[in-house]
UniProtKB/Swiss-Prot annotation:
One of its GO terms (cellular component) is ribonuclease H2 complex. The gene is rnhB. Keywords: Cytoplasm, Endonuclease, Hydrolase, Manganese, Metal-binding, Nuclease. HAMAP family: RNase_HII_B (MF_00052_B). The keyword Manganese applies. InterPro entries: RNase_HII, RNase_HII/HIII, RNase_HII/HIII_dom, RNaseH-like_sf, RNaseH_sf. Residues 29-219 form the RNase H type-2 domain. Its EC number is 3.1.26.4. GO terms for molecular function: manganese ion binding; RNA binding; RNA-DNA hybrid ribonuclease activity. Belongs to the RNase HII family. The lineage of its organism: Bacteria, Pseudomonadati, Pseudomonadota, Betaproteobacteria, Burkholderiales. This is Ribonuclease HII. Transmembrane segments: none annotated.
């Protein structure tokens, strides 16, 4: 899934030559902000967004880390961002890619797709977190960037709203899991549904609670009602990012 905007592709002469430069921001830079949503959930894709703002235009008010905004505010800002951004792209990595690559590398893949899908070529990509995907342009990891860099804040909002809407669609075909309530995260409601119904094709079988629920039901030994599946903190904290994501 990739959504993008802008009528034609633009680039800046010499951008590739600046790739290895030490000056990470010059007045001529076209800065792109990148963030993701959905590293921690037990189900659904991981979604990334890339946003470029026109520096000559007034900045959208109210941009912030999507996690501190209400759903209503995120929806309002989503419409403003897609209307006023110089360019944006929303991309994802599938559940199958998450299970085959691990969540870290699938997230990097979604981010790479978002940047490469932009209709305007950036000269500097600022990414929330402490890792950057392999890109053909300069990139910089910004810890806490979704609250510090406006284009990253915008990307976090696009990614979050898009993914939440995708999980609402999944709820229509798989209502027993309550995706409309938790967006795939490992809440008690979701874990209970996994115990009772087992995982569906949209669950991440590389994640321990899903894998264990599938194993219990496939062997005819469902979890007792009082038994608790231990869920790694990476599933609940979208800022907890590291290789351990593959072993959840």
């Amino acid at each position: 899934m990739t959504l993008s905007r802008a009528p034609r592709r633009k680039t800046v002469a010499g951008a590739s030559a600046q790739q290895v430069g030490l000056n990470f921001e010059t007045p001529d830079d076209i800065v792109c902000g990148v963030d993701e949503a959905g590293r921690g959930p037990l189900a659904g894709p991981v979604v990334a967004a890339a946003v470029i703002f026109d520096p000559s235009k007034p900045m959208i008010r109210g941009l912030d880390d999507s996690k501190v905004l209400t759903a209503k505010k995120r929806d309002e800002l989503y419409d403003k961002i897609v209307d006023r951004a110089l360019a944006y792209c929303i991309a994802s990595a599938t559940v199958e890619e998450i299970d085959s690559l691990n969540i870290l590398h699938a997230t990097m893949l979604a981010m790479k797709r978002a940047v490469e899908g932009l209709s305007v070529v950036p000269t500097l990509v600022k990414i929330d977190g402490n890792r950057c995907p392999t890109l053909s342009v300069r990139s910089e990891a910004v810890i806490g960037g979704d609250a510090l860099v406006k284009s990253i804040s915008a990307a976090s909002i696009l990614a979050k709203v898009t993914r939440d809407r995708m999980l609402l669609e999944l709820h229509q075909t798989h209502p027993v899991y309550g995706f409309n309530a938790h967006a795939g995260y490992g809440t008690p409601q979701h874990l209970k549904a996994l115990r009772e119904h087992g995982p569906c094709e949209h669950h991440r079988r590389s994640f321990a609670p899903v894998r264990e629920a599938h194993l219990r039901l496939s062997t005819g030994m469902p979890l007792p009602a009082g038994e608790v599946i231990v869920v790694s903190e990476v599933m609940f904290d979208d800022d907890a990012f590291g290789e351990r994501g593959s072993a959840v």
